[in-house]
Amino acid sequence: MAFANFRRILRLPNFEKKRLREYEHVRRDVDPNQVWEIIGELGDGAFGKVYKAKNRETGILAAAKVIETKNEEELEDYMVEIEILATCNHHFIVKLLGAFYWEGKLWIMIEFCPGGAVDAVMLELDRGLKEPEIKTICRQMLEALAYLHSMKIIHRDLKAGNVLLTLDGDIKLADFGVSAKNVKTLQRRDSFIGTPYWMAPEVVMCETMKDAPYDYKADIWSLGITLIEMAQIEPPHHELNPMRVLLKIAKSEPPTLSSLSKWSPEFHSFLKTALDKNPETRPSAAQLLEHPFVKKASGNKPLRDLVAEAKAEVLDEIEEQGEAEEEEDSDMLSPKTKGVSQSTHVEIGKDIEREQVGNGIKPHSATSPQKTDSQADNYSQRRNNEVKNCPENGRPDAVNGKPDIIILNPLSSNLEPKRNSTAESYRGEEHSSASSQRQRSAQSAELVPNGSFDSPTRYFTNWSKRDSDSGSNSASESMDISMNLSADLSMNKETGFLSHRENRLHKKTLKRTRRFVVDGVEVSITTSKIIGDDEKKDEEMRFLRRQELRELRLLQKEEHRHQAQLTSKHSFQLEQMSRRFEQEMNSKRKFYDTELETLERHQKQQIVWMEQEHAFRRRDEAKHIKTEQERDHIKFLEQLKLRKKELKAHVEKLPRQQRRETMKVQMDGFAHKKQTEEQQFVNRQKEDLNLAMRVIVLENRKEIYNKEREFLNKKQQLLRDRESVIWELEERHLQERHQLVKQQLKDQYFLQRHELLRKHEKEQEQMQRYNQRMMEQLRLRQQQEKVRLPKNQKAEAKTRMTMFKKSLHISPSGSAAEQRDKIKQFSLQEEKRQKAERLQQQQKHEHQLMEMLAECDCNVRDLLQMQNEKCHLLVEHETQKLKSLDEHHIQLIREWRENIRPRKKAFEDELELKKEAQEMFFRLNEEVAGDPFLSNKPTRFYSFSSPEAS
């Protein structure tokens, strides 16, 4: 079910499937075999094999990294590395010589560095680097990092295995497979990727917390760890499991050099400055270049000498210690030496002689180490401790011996050394051979570089000894001698005498002679060291740790790809939601804009129609009134005529003498009165007409005003509806976005849990293999002890019997029969002692087995506890993030609602202003319409929303 959910989370829409892309720096139309010739295999990395290739035209050498890809998505995973290599042009960074994609394989051609990787050189020389060498490498690495960081690139996998050396004494930073190319210089990343031992604390925290991303300062921490690795061969906490070291990095103090007096104060100061757990106060690469430790470093002569020493011709000789020689040496030891040896102490030294000659090399003889005894367990423990700590006096430890090396013939000076660079140089995963032509036994698991040392001082191997053949010079009774011998052997047994004697027979002495040229002078260095069975175990542990790192890197790569896919899906979902929100918003706006346009168009048509109707109405009404007034005017004139007739008739009734004069007076008065009355009548008709027209105009204007107000109300209601819908959309969008982001956060943590469970399964698998390996080693060792015990007991019984008989011969007492009884009694005691010894060995083996089982169970419990803590921390962090997200959403909704109130008020105020403006507009028109001087002017009405009205 969980896997189905995981597939559902990473599933992208069908139309988002990418077509075949054409990459700028990758050629798809050329077979790389036609351009490059494969001349050898360099190694096998985590994602593919690395070959040594030669350009068929120019003859340039390259390291060809060949990676099989199943699909285009996997091909895209390597594009960042190719792009970084193609864009970077720096003296201390490897260059990209070409990239091809042919028949499902990606070929990345990288600049070839004959000196190999720094960690391979340290294994070759069996020592850490000297401070001048570290100083030179550090300065060049800082210059390369300063350039990378200026190009907005975070390397994210700095370690000695990714620092290559050239024959000119320069370094080349390599392996950008997990690097990040940012858009901004201060851009942060939250990917949990890199190699655990070199990870910065802020990168480790990203395994369970993505809200504390890191920046380019993570490379500075990795640089400091790399310097410690160069000084001590191994990085800090190398004895821990790769997954368990993460907890150590996060919780412990920054690591330091194990030896204080061996290194300069400037070196310690530099490491203290670089290994600052707070990335904010951690300096940049440019600032560290001003540190006194690297500021004084000039030139690259130390690295040239280092490469020359690593590429030297090597002669290995093996000297095996025989049993007879051991017994002879054992007889020569004094009882005093025997007594001292009860506290087991192992020191492995080397004899070194260096002689510079003008034209040739003189053979050197190594001083044979003194043959010693020690317990096998203590020896193994001491060897492991020696790998962890370098001596304070700068002398190299004798580590990483090779138990499967056979005696080699001397190399002639005219033979060209056969060297293979390392796959670690390009993937940081494998160490391959960097030695001269050398014969090894067929059982050798892999070629490991041989070692050399820089100091001409002699080293001697002093092993504390304890021998069983002590003898007795006292003339005591036979039974006393028997009891002393039994007690002595019992004490020897308790201190691991028997197993140690057998272990002593398997020790070998390796004498190695290196010949190389320094500044035109040939130098010969001869080293000698004792190797044992633990050498092979150390090599196996190193190989298994590389396997674990490789498995971890594969998991990180897959996790990074899944994270990128999920991030791409989330980005697409957010973008799709934003587009949908915008479309919905635009759709609603468009709908209401269309409604408003329709309403305004209808309003305009309605107003125009009303104005036309009003014009027709005014014209008809004016025509009707004028017709009535003309009729009234005619009636008024007829009345005046009638009155004139009546006046004439009345004057005709007067006497003739008065008639003419009276007629004239009466007619003049009547004419004047008629003119006055007629003028008044016409004026009254005009007033009536104007009044009627004014009433009609006011009625029309009122109708238009009502219609305009009706349309304005409808328009404002539409605007209110639009704003309400927009606000609802905004709130719904906030809710939907919150739900999407919340679901994406859950998907993100689901993916993290899934990847964390995969890591935990891999950790448990590795722990199971480790426990199984420890149990197998214990059973094998116990089986060997069980097989050796009868042989040792037989030899010891023979020796003790001989000693007992000698003691009887030295101090004879009693008759021959009594002596035979004593011998018989001694034999019975020997049988009892051997039986008790076998029983004690069985009990010891059972106890060891129980302890080993308890230790394995404890390891599993500790691992499960740590895994449970990580899971709990991840779940707790998810809960906190979800809670924080909900609180943020609630706060956002609260702020949005608080902002809605002033928006609503401003919107209503704007609508009210439009109403007031409309009322003001019609009020002014009414005042204009009521002006008596303008009453005769034709009136034209406009819509309030029309441009003429405004």
UniProtKB/Swiss-Prot annotation:
Residues making up the signal peptide according to the UniProt record: none
Catalysis: reaction(s): L-seryl-[protein] + ATP = O-phospho-L-seryl-[protein] + ADP + H(+); L-threonyl-[protein] + ATP = O-phospho-L-threonyl-[protein] + ADP + H(+)
PTM section of the record: Autophosphorylates. Phosphorylated by plk1/plx1, suggesting the existence of a feedback loop with plk1/plx1. activation of the protein.
Assigned EC number: 2.7.11.1
Localisation per UniProt entry: Cell membrane
Keywords, in A-Z order: ATP-binding, Cell cycle, Cell membrane, Coiled coil, Kinase, Membrane, Nucleotide-binding, Phosphoprotein, Serine/threonine-protein kinase, Transferase
Pfam assignment, any one: PKK
A GO CC term attached to the entry: plasma membrane
Cited PROSITE patterns: PROTEIN_KINASE_ATP, PROTEIN_KINASE_DOM, PROTEIN_KINASE_ST
Database matches in SUPFAM superfamilies: Protein kinase-like (PK-like)
Composition bias type Low complexity, residue spans: 433-445
InterPro entries to which the protein is assigned, alphabetical: Kinase-like_dom_sf, PKK, Prot_kinase_dom, Protein_kinase_ATP_BS, Ser/Thr_kinase_AS, STE20_Ser/Thr_Kinases, STK10_STKc
Compositionally biased spans, kind Acidic residues: 319-331
Composition skew (Basic and acidic residues), residue ranges: 347-356, 416-432
Class in the EC hierarchy, top level: transferase
Annotated coiled-coil segments of the chain: 634-786
Active-site residues annotated for this sequence: D157
Family assignment from sequence similarity: Belongs to the protein kinase superfamily. STE Ser/Thr protein kinase family. STE20 subfamily.
Known function: May act as a polo kinase kinase by mediating phosphorylation of plk1/plx1 and subsequent activation of plk1/plx1 during oocyte maturation.
Oligomer status and interactors: Homodimer.
Protein name: Serine/threonine-protein kinase 10-A
Naturally occurring in which organism (per UniProt): Xenopus laevis (African clawed frog)
Lineage, opening ranks: Eukaryota, Metazoa, Chordata, Craniata, Vertebrata
Gene: stk10-a
